[in-house]
């Protein structure tokens, strides 16, 4: 979701949107083939046995843990805010600020670089500050950024302030994502697969919910995007 708009914008210079869907179909076929040919690298003696029954038991064990459930909800709401940005930013840049698909992809690419940079910084400071501190800082940054973006949309701020706000807001995903995941997995190393599945489901489920909500107000307003972002960000703080 971060790199795809940048690549798609460049492809539109040479092709049409129909070709992009053909490329997606080809990549999907390659992934399907790869999944069929992929061989498990973990030695048999270290693999978790029990199949679906064990996995289901692990899921219930994890969900009953209030701390793990709390981190799952943080993933749900925080990624909800992030995917609201993913879903709505093209409308903001192209329909409100009248940028071309290529210009939008450049700005989106800059934000992607910011996300990578924030991830590198997070790794550097992880020995100095705790995961909880990183998580708290990033969620506050996400909330403040979302609020500023909503204000910017209401009062029709120009492009540069809006772009700056979205840059620092988008950077938080690599901070709260890794910190929350680390905190959730602390007690459940032996259930890493099940825990990772729940956390991944939480973030992707949020994406499925917020994406259509962002477009409810039409293509020429960013207010629904801002409202969705601030609501999700504020709930992640709870």
Segments the model singles out, each with a brief description of its role:
Residues 41-72:
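Juxtamembrane intracellular "pre-TM" segments in multi-pass secondary transporters
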Residues 1-38, 106:
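Helix-loop-helix hairpin linking two adjacent transmembrane segments in secondary transporters
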Residues 182-223, 228-229:
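A late C-terminal transmembrane helix in Major Facilitator Superfamily
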Residues 118-132:
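Helix-to-loop junctions at the C-terminal end of transmembrane segments
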Residues 133-179:
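C-terminal transmembrane helical hairpin of 12-TM major facilitator-type secondary transporters
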